[in-house]
Curated annotation (Swiss-Prot):
GO terms for biological process: defense response. It comes from Phyllomedusa trinitatis. This is Dermaseptin-2.2TR. Expressed by the skin glands. Has antimicrobial activity. GO terms for cellular component: extracellular region.
Length: 28
């Protein structure tokens, strides 16, 4: 279903954003 694909993409984007934030915090 289309909404499932959208949800998956949103989840991936959110996961990447969280990962980037954590990585930035660790690097500082």
């Amino acid at each position: 279903a289309l909404w499932k694909d959208i949800l998956k993409n949103v989840g991936k984007a959110a996961g990447k954003a969280v990962l980037n934030t954590v990585t930035d915090m660790v690097n500082e």
